[in-house]
Amino acid sequence: MELTDKASFRDAMAHVGAAVNIITTDGPAGRAGFTASAVCSVTDTPPTLLVCLNRSASVWPVFSEHHTLCVNTLAAGQEALSTLFGGKTAMDERFAAADWQTGATGCPRLEAALVSFDCRIDQRVSVGTHDILFCHVVAITRHPEPRGLMWFDRGYHTLMRPAC
């Protein structure tokens, strides 16, 4: 099938499952956070993630001024928090909906996250409508009971560790 429009691309990408993340930052430009599924590992030497952020997003000006962020991968049952950070809700309301700690980079770290990656942004690359942030991981916090949350086919799905 030849790709002819962005709707076809988006429909195809809906069939690719992804972890659900809340990306947070804090610093001179303020505190901000957004929901993202366009996050993945790049390499383990040095430990690096990439985060994609639309330059038209309301949080873009804040993230563009900061050099650190925290990738908070959501656990099962945190769908409402994902929706809150994915909408037009005021930042104070978003952060008031959960318990946060200050991570190693000074960014908000979600206490109940499946895993949190505190990162230093090492590089930014603009592609189309988005900035790709290459993030060096400086600290990791893991939840003791892994129950994942995935975004697949435009909906949330829970992942559980097999009993065997």
Curated annotation (Swiss-Prot):
Pfam families registered for this protein in UniProt: Flavin_Reduct
EC number(s) given by UniProt: 1.5.1.42
Keyword Oxidoreductase attributed: yes
Keyword match Flavoprotein: yes
Gene Ontology MF terms in the entry: FMN binding; FMN reductase (NADH) activity; FMN reductase [NAD(P)H] activity; riboflavin reductase (NADPH) activity
Catalytic activity: FMNH2 + NAD(+) = FMN + NADH + 2 H(+)
Top EC class of this enzyme: oxidoreductase
Keywords: Flavoprotein, FMN, NAD, Oxidoreductase
Gene Ontology annotations of biological process type: nitrogen utilization; uracil catabolic process
InterPro entries according to UniProt: Flavin_Rdtase-like_dom, NADH-dep_flavin_reductase, RutF, Split_barrel_FMN-bd
NCBIfam families: RutF (TIGR03615)
Function of the protein: Catalyzes the reduction of FMN to FMNH2 which is used to reduce pyrimidine by RutA via the Rut pathway.
Similarity field: Belongs to the non-flavoprotein flavin reductase family. RutF subfamily.
Protein name as annotated: FMN reductase (NADH) RutF
Organism the protein comes from: Klebsiella pneumoniae subsp. pneumoniae (strain ATCC 700721 / MGH 78578)
